[in-house]
Amino acid sequence: MTTIPITKRGAEKLKQELHHLKTVERPSVITAIAEARAQGDLSENADYDAAKDRQGFVEGRIQEIEGKLSVAQVIDPGEVDGGGKVVFGATVQLEDEESGDTVTYQIVGEDEADLKQGLINISSPIARALIGKEEGDTAEVQAPSGIRRYEVVAVSYR
């Protein structure tokens, strides 16, 4: 079975969502189904149909999270010794060689990615181009507008 990398923060976030789904959402859906059943005829009961749809979503998400957590390899970026190289969990400061703009990204797992917060998916084109690079190296990324070149300015593990 293949493991999937996830940061300690990402694993905690998934565990919190799972707890919420099991302790709040699931009981709420069960109550909604019971209330809809009490209305009588289920063949044309929109409340019942909506509650059953919601139950399907909640149960599906619970299974999805449990599956991901069962194969997750939890990595604490603060404990990573990448030897100065860009690895999973590393925070990387980059300079666009064309524009001179600087950006900072942390390389995280699929469920944690949020570009607005500077969190990029390990399987994204830019993360794949950065893995193994060191400060001073240049990474080339295929973008819709053509190849972009970024210099690795700093690498940290936090």
From Swiss-Prot:
Family the UniProt entry places it in: Belongs to the GreA/GreB family.
PROSITE patterns attached to this UniProt entry: GREAB_1
Record function comment: Necessary for efficient RNA polymerase transcription elongation past template-encoded arresting sites. The arresting sites in DNA have the property of trapping a certain fraction of elongating RNA polymerases that pass through, resulting in locked ternary complexes. Cleavage of the nascent transcript by cleavage factors such as GreA or GreB allows the resumption of elongation from the new 3'terminus. GreA releases sequences of 2 to 3 nucleotides.
Keywords of this entry: DNA-binding, Transcription, Transcription regulation
NCBIfam families with a match to the protein in the record: greA (TIGR01462), PRK00226.1-2 (NF001261), PRK00226.1-4 (NF001263), PRK00226.1-5 (NF001264)
Sample GO molecular function, one term: DNA binding
Organism: Verminephrobacter eiseniae (strain EF01-2)
A Pfam family it matches: GreA_GreB_N
Underlying gene: greA
Gene Ontology BP term (one): regulation of DNA-templated transcription elongation
Disulfide bonds: none
InterPro entries recorded: GreA/GreB_C_sf (IPR036953), TF_GreA/GreB_CS (IPR018151), Tscrpt_elong_fac_GreA (IPR006359), Tscrpt_elong_fac_GreA/B (IPR028624), Tscrpt_elong_fac_GreA/B_C (IPR001437), Tscrpt_elong_fac_GreA/B_fam (IPR023459), Tscrpt_elong_fac_GreA/B_N (IPR022691), Tscrpt_elong_fac_GreA/B_N_sf (IPR036805)
Protein name from the UniProt record: Transcription elongation factor GreA
